[in-house]
Protein backbone atom coordinates (compact mmCIF):
# COMPACT_ATOMS: atom_id res chain seq x y z
CA UNK A 1 0.00 0.00 0.00
CA UNK A 2 1.41 3.44 -0.91
CA UNK A 3 1.93 5.64 2.15
CA UNK A 4 -0.49 8.52 2.79
CA UNK A 5 2.47 10.91 2.51
CA UNK A 6 3.04 9.71 -1.08
CA UNK A 7 -0.59 10.36 -2.06
CA UNK A 8 -0.40 13.83 -0.52
CA UNK A 9 2.85 14.44 -2.40
CA UNK A 10 1.16 13.41 -5.67
CA UNK A 11 -1.69 15.90 -5.08
CA UNK A 12 0.71 18.74 -4.18
CA UNK A 13 2.96 17.95 -7.15
CA UNK A 14 0.18 18.53 -9.71
CA UNK A 15 -1.51 21.54 -8.06
CA UNK A 16 0.46 24.01 -10.25
CA UNK A 17 -1.26 22.46 -13.31
CA UNK A 18 -4.67 23.77 -12.21
CA UNK A 19 -5.92 26.39 -14.65
CA UNK A 20 -4.28 24.76 -17.68
CA UNK A 21 -7.24 22.54 -18.63
CA UNK A 22 -10.92 23.18 -19.33
CA UNK A 23 -13.96 21.88 -17.45
CA UNK A 24 -16.47 20.02 -19.68
CA UNK A 25 -19.16 22.53 -20.60
CA UNK A 26 -21.35 20.73 -23.13
CA UNK A 27 -23.98 20.28 -20.45
CA UNK A 28 -24.66 22.97 -17.82
CA UNK A 29 -24.67 20.51 -14.90
CA UNK A 30 -21.01 19.64 -15.55
CA UNK A 31 -19.88 23.19 -16.32
CA UNK A 32 -20.72 24.38 -12.79
CA UNK A 33 -18.17 22.11 -11.03
CA UNK A 34 -15.36 23.74 -9.02
CA UNK A 35 -12.30 23.46 -11.30
CA UNK A 36 -9.86 23.56 -8.39
CA UNK A 37 -10.65 20.11 -7.00
CA UNK A 38 -8.00 17.38 -6.79
CA UNK A 39 -8.42 13.93 -5.29
CA UNK A 40 -6.81 10.49 -5.32
CA UNK A 41 -7.70 7.17 -3.67
CA UNK A 42 -6.15 3.71 -3.88
CA UNK A 43 -7.56 0.35 -2.79
CA UNK A 44 -5.31 -2.68 -2.41
CA UNK A 45 -6.28 -6.29 -3.15
CA UNK A 46 -6.33 -6.73 0.66
CA UNK A 47 -9.28 -4.30 0.74
CA UNK A 48 -7.50 -1.32 2.32
CA UNK A 49 -8.36 2.16 1.01
CA UNK A 50 -6.32 5.34 1.39
CA UNK A 51 -6.95 8.78 -0.08
CA UNK A 52 -5.70 12.37 -0.27
CA UNK A 53 -7.10 15.71 -1.36
CA UNK A 54 -10.80 15.87 -2.30
CA UNK A 55 -11.09 12.09 -2.51
CA UNK A 56 -14.39 11.92 -0.60
CA UNK A 57 -16.19 14.49 -2.75
CA UNK A 58 -18.68 12.90 -5.19
CA UNK A 59 -18.50 13.76 -8.89
CA UNK A 60 -20.19 12.68 -12.12
CA UNK A 61 -18.41 9.51 -13.29
CA UNK A 62 -19.61 9.85 -16.91
CA UNK A 63 -17.77 7.41 -19.24
CA UNK A 64 -16.16 5.50 -16.37
CA UNK A 65 -19.64 3.91 -16.12
CA UNK A 66 -18.92 2.16 -19.45
CA UNK A 67 -16.64 -0.23 -17.54
CA UNK A 68 -19.52 -1.19 -15.24
CA UNK A 69 -22.01 -1.62 -18.10
CA UNK A 70 -19.64 -3.87 -20.09
CA UNK A 71 -18.93 -5.89 -16.93
CA UNK A 72 -22.66 -6.29 -16.30
CA UNK A 73 -23.18 -7.40 -19.93
CA UNK A 74 -20.41 -10.01 -19.50
CA UNK A 75 -22.39 -11.52 -16.60
CA UNK A 76 -25.58 -11.73 -18.70
CA UNK A 77 -24.50 -12.69 -22.23
CA UNK A 78 -22.28 -15.18 -24.00
CA UNK A 79 -19.17 -13.30 -25.11
CA UNK A 80 -19.83 -14.09 -28.78
CA UNK A 81 -23.17 -12.25 -28.55
CA UNK A 82 -21.44 -9.10 -27.26
CA UNK A 83 -18.48 -9.09 -29.65
CA UNK A 84 -20.64 -9.77 -32.71
CA UNK A 85 -22.17 -6.33 -32.09
CA UNK A 86 -19.21 -4.28 -30.86
CA UNK A 87 -15.49 -4.46 -31.71
CA UNK A 88 -12.30 -4.47 -29.67
CA UNK A 89 -10.19 -1.96 -31.62
CA UNK A 90 -9.07 1.59 -30.76
CA UNK A 91 -11.17 4.16 -32.55
CA UNK A 92 -8.90 6.94 -33.83
CA UNK A 93 -12.01 9.12 -34.21
CA UNK A 94 -13.76 11.32 -31.66
CA UNK A 95 -15.69 9.40 -28.98
CA UNK A 96 -19.02 10.54 -30.47
CA UNK A 97 -18.18 10.02 -34.15
CA UNK A 98 -20.99 9.24 -36.61
CA UNK A 99 -18.59 8.84 -39.54
CA UNK A 100 -17.02 5.67 -38.17
CA UNK A 101 -20.42 4.09 -37.47
CA UNK A 102 -21.40 4.75 -41.08
CA UNK A 103 -18.12 3.48 -42.56
CA UNK A 104 -18.16 0.30 -40.48
CA UNK A 105 -21.81 -0.48 -41.18
CA UNK A 106 -23.18 0.08 -37.70
CA UNK A 107 -20.64 -1.89 -35.65
CA UNK A 108 -18.81 0.37 -33.16
CA UNK A 109 -15.05 0.01 -32.78
CA UNK A 110 -15.08 -0.67 -29.02
CA UNK A 111 -17.37 -0.57 -25.95
CA UNK A 112 -15.81 2.62 -24.54
CA UNK A 113 -16.80 5.10 -27.25
CA UNK A 114 -20.39 6.36 -27.20
CA UNK A 115 -21.61 4.14 -30.03
CA UNK A 116 -20.20 1.03 -28.35
CA UNK A 117 -21.58 1.96 -24.94
CA UNK A 118 -25.01 2.54 -26.51
CA UNK A 119 -24.94 -0.99 -27.97
CA UNK A 120 -24.03 -2.34 -24.50
CA UNK A 121 -26.89 -0.31 -22.95
CA UNK A 122 -29.20 -1.75 -25.63
CA UNK A 123 -28.08 -5.28 -24.68
CA UNK A 124 -28.73 -4.57 -20.98
CA UNK A 125 -32.10 -2.96 -21.70
CA UNK A 126 -33.27 -6.03 -23.63
CA UNK A 127 -32.12 -8.52 -20.98
CA UNK A 128 -33.01 -6.71 -17.73
CA UNK A 129 -36.42 -5.64 -16.45
CA UNK A 130 -34.97 -2.68 -14.55
CA UNK A 131 -31.51 -1.88 -16.00
CA UNK A 132 -31.09 1.38 -14.06
CA UNK A 133 -31.90 -0.30 -10.75
CA UNK A 134 -29.59 -3.24 -11.54
CA UNK A 135 -26.69 -0.89 -12.27
CA UNK A 136 -27.25 1.02 -9.03
CA UNK A 137 -27.38 -2.27 -7.14
CA UNK A 138 -24.08 -3.37 -8.74
CA UNK A 139 -22.08 -0.19 -8.04
CA UNK A 140 -23.39 0.07 -4.48
CA UNK A 141 -22.33 -3.51 -3.86
CA UNK A 142 -18.90 -3.04 -5.50
CA UNK A 143 -18.17 0.23 -3.68
CA UNK A 144 -19.71 -0.93 -0.40
CA UNK A 145 -21.60 2.36 -0.31
CA UNK A 146 -25.42 2.37 -0.31
CA UNK A 147 -25.45 6.16 -0.76
CA UNK A 148 -24.18 6.00 -4.36
CA UNK A 149 -26.93 7.41 -6.58
CA UNK A 150 -27.80 8.87 -9.97
CA UNK A 151 -27.61 12.65 -10.31
CA UNK A 152 -31.01 13.35 -11.85
CA UNK A 153 -30.04 16.88 -12.86
CA UNK A 154 -27.07 15.58 -14.87
CA UNK A 155 -29.14 12.76 -16.46
CA UNK A 156 -31.88 15.24 -17.47
CA UNK A 157 -29.33 17.74 -18.75
CA UNK A 158 -27.67 15.06 -20.92
CA UNK A 159 -31.04 13.94 -22.25
CA UNK A 160 -31.86 17.51 -23.27
CA UNK A 161 -28.60 17.63 -25.24
CA UNK A 162 -28.87 14.13 -26.71
CA UNK A 163 -29.28 14.80 -30.44
CA UNK A 164 -25.89 13.38 -31.40
CA UNK A 165 -26.19 10.22 -29.31
CA UNK A 166 -29.71 9.71 -30.68
CA UNK A 167 -28.32 10.09 -34.21
CA UNK A 168 -25.65 7.44 -33.47
CA UNK A 169 -28.31 5.05 -32.09
CA UNK A 170 -30.64 5.53 -35.08
CA UNK A 171 -27.75 5.07 -37.51
CA UNK A 172 -26.85 1.76 -35.82
CA UNK A 173 -30.54 0.80 -35.88
CA UNK A 174 -30.58 1.37 -39.65
CA UNK A 175 -27.78 -1.24 -39.90
CA UNK A 176 -29.69 -3.67 -37.67
CA UNK A 177 -27.35 -3.27 -34.68
CA UNK A 178 -29.76 -1.65 -32.23
CA UNK A 179 -32.82 -3.53 -31.05
CA UNK A 180 -34.52 -1.43 -28.38
CA UNK A 181 -36.49 1.79 -28.34
CA UNK A 182 -33.87 4.51 -28.84
CA UNK A 183 -35.41 6.95 -26.37
CA UNK A 184 -35.66 4.34 -23.59
CA UNK A 185 -32.07 3.14 -24.08
CA UNK A 186 -30.76 6.72 -24.17
CA UNK A 187 -32.41 7.46 -20.83
CA UNK A 188 -30.80 4.35 -19.32
CA UNK A 189 -27.41 5.27 -20.81
CA UNK A 190 -27.56 8.84 -19.46
CA UNK A 191 -28.45 7.58 -16.00
CA UNK A 192 -25.38 5.34 -16.06
CA UNK A 193 -23.21 8.35 -17.02
CA UNK A 194 -24.87 10.40 -14.26
CA UNK A 195 -23.75 8.08 -11.45
CA UNK A 196 -22.25 10.16 -8.66
CA UNK A 197 -19.31 8.62 -6.82
CA UNK A 198 -16.13 9.76 -5.11
CA UNK A 199 -12.54 8.56 -5.58
CA UNK A 200 -12.78 6.16 -2.62
CA UNK A 201 -16.02 4.63 -3.99
CA UNK A 202 -14.51 4.14 -7.44
CA UNK A 203 -11.18 2.74 -6.29
CA UNK A 204 -13.10 0.15 -4.24
CA UNK A 205 -15.62 -0.56 -7.01
CA UNK A 206 -12.88 -1.18 -9.60
CA UNK A 207 -10.87 -3.52 -7.36
CA UNK A 208 -12.16 -6.56 -9.29
CA UNK A 209 -10.02 -5.40 -12.24
CA UNK A 210 -6.91 -5.67 -10.05
CA UNK A 211 -8.05 -8.81 -8.25
CA UNK A 212 -8.68 -11.38 -11.02
CA UNK A 213 -12.39 -10.56 -11.24
CA UNK A 214 -13.11 -10.67 -7.52
CA UNK A 215 -14.79 -7.70 -5.84
CA UNK A 216 -13.75 -6.14 -2.53
CA UNK A 217 -16.00 -8.66 -0.73
CA UNK A 218 -14.20 -11.59 -2.43
CA UNK A 219 -17.16 -12.43 -4.70
CA UNK A 220 -16.23 -13.38 -8.27
CA UNK A 221 -17.88 -10.91 -10.62
CA UNK A 222 -16.22 -12.00 -13.87
CA UNK A 223 -13.63 -14.69 -14.57
CA UNK A 224 -9.87 -14.22 -14.40
CA UNK A 225 -9.63 -14.49 -18.20
CA UNK A 226 -12.41 -11.92 -18.71
CA UNK A 227 -10.67 -9.56 -16.29
CA UNK A 228 -7.42 -9.81 -18.24
CA UNK A 229 -9.30 -9.17 -21.50
CA UNK A 230 -11.16 -6.20 -20.02
CA UNK A 231 -7.87 -4.69 -18.80
CA UNK A 232 -6.42 -5.16 -22.30
CA UNK A 233 -9.33 -3.20 -23.79
CA UNK A 234 -8.88 -0.47 -21.17
CA UNK A 235 -5.18 -0.22 -22.04
CA UNK A 236 -5.89 0.22 -25.76
CA UNK A 237 -9.18 2.14 -25.76
CA UNK A 238 -9.93 3.51 -22.29
CA UNK A 239 -8.82 7.10 -22.79
CA UNK A 240 -10.43 8.26 -26.03
CA UNK A 241 -7.71 9.47 -28.43
CA UNK A 242 -5.24 9.82 -25.55
CA UNK A 243 -4.80 6.07 -24.96
CA UNK A 244 -1.30 5.94 -26.47
CA UNK A 245 -0.11 8.99 -24.54
CA UNK A 246 -1.59 7.55 -21.33
CA UNK A 247 0.08 4.17 -21.89
CA UNK A 248 3.39 5.96 -22.49
CA UNK A 249 3.14 8.22 -19.42
CA UNK A 250 1.22 6.05 -16.93
CA UNK A 251 1.54 2.46 -18.16
CA UNK A 252 -1.68 1.11 -16.64
CA UNK A 253 -5.10 0.06 -17.97
CA UNK A 254 -7.44 2.99 -17.33
CA UNK A 255 -10.77 4.64 -18.08
CA UNK A 256 -11.55 8.32 -18.03
CA UNK A 257 -14.74 10.36 -17.96
CA UNK A 258 -15.44 14.00 -18.85
CA UNK A 259 -16.42 14.60 -15.22
CA UNK A 260 -12.64 14.61 -14.58
CA UNK A 261 -12.31 11.15 -13.07
CA UNK A 262 -9.86 8.46 -14.20
CA UNK A 263 -9.66 4.93 -12.84
CA UNK A 264 -6.47 2.89 -13.30
CA UNK A 265 -5.32 -0.56 -12.31
CA UNK A 266 -2.09 -2.27 -11.30
CA UNK A 267 -3.16 -5.93 -11.80
CA UNK A 268 -2.55 -8.09 -8.75
CA UNK A 269 -1.93 -5.06 -6.53
CA UNK A 270 -4.34 -2.14 -6.47
CA UNK A 271 -6.98 0.00 -8.13
CA UNK A 272 -6.71 3.78 -8.24
CA UNK A 273 -9.10 6.65 -8.86
CA UNK A 274 -8.04 10.25 -9.44
CA UNK A 275 -10.24 13.28 -9.97
CA UNK A 276 -9.62 16.78 -11.27
CA UNK A 277 -12.38 18.37 -13.40
CA UNK A 278 -10.18 20.27 -15.87
CA UNK A 279 -9.69 18.28 -19.09
CA UNK A 280 -6.98 18.19 -21.74
CA UNK A 281 -7.66 18.31 -25.49
CA UNK A 282 -8.62 14.61 -25.57
CA UNK A 283 -11.26 14.97 -22.84
CA UNK A 284 -9.11 13.35 -20.14
CA UNK A 285 -8.37 14.92 -16.75
CA UNK A 286 -5.19 16.95 -17.17
CA UNK A 287 -4.04 16.96 -13.53
CA UNK A 288 -5.52 13.47 -13.04
CA UNK A 289 -3.24 12.01 -15.71
CA UNK A 290 -0.28 13.81 -14.12
CA UNK A 291 -1.18 12.36 -10.69
CA UNK A 292 -1.21 8.84 -12.12
CA UNK A 293 2.06 9.44 -13.99
CA UNK A 294 3.76 10.66 -10.81
CA UNK A 295 2.35 7.77 -8.76
CA UNK A 296 3.45 5.13 -11.29
CA UNK A 297 6.97 6.61 -11.38
CA UNK A 298 7.23 6.75 -7.58
CA UNK A 299 5.92 3.19 -7.22
CA UNK A 300 8.04 1.96 -10.13
CA UNK A 301 4.99 0.23 -11.62
CA UNK A 302 3.87 -0.25 -15.22
CA UNK A 303 2.23 -3.14 -17.04
CA UNK A 304 4.76 -2.72 -19.85
Curated annotation (Swiss-Prot):
Binding site residues for substrate: 63, 114, 158, 165, 189, 240, 258
Entry keyword annotation includes Hydrolase: yes
The EC number(s) this enzyme carries: 3.5.1.2
Record key words, sorted: Hydrolase
Domain of life according to the entry: Bacteria
Reaction catalysis annotation: L-glutamine + H2O = L-glutamate + NH4(+)
A GO term, aspect molecular function: glutaminase activity
Pfam families: Glutaminase
Top EC group: hydrolase
UniProt record, GO biological process: glutamate biosynthetic process; glutamine catabolic process
Keyword presence, NADP: no
Database matches in InterPro entries: Beta-lactam/transpept-like (IPR012338), Glutaminase (IPR015868)
Sequence similarity: Belongs to the glutaminase family.
Protein name in the entry: Glutaminase
Amino acid sequence: MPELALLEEVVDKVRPLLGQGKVADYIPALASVDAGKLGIAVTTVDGETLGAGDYLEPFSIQSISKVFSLTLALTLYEEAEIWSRVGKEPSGHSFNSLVQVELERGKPRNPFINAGALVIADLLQSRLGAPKHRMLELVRQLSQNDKVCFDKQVADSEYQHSARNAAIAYLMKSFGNFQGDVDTVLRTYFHYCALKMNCADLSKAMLYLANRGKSITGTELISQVQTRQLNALLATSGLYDGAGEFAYRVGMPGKSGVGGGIIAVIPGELSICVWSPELDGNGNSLAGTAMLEHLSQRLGRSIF
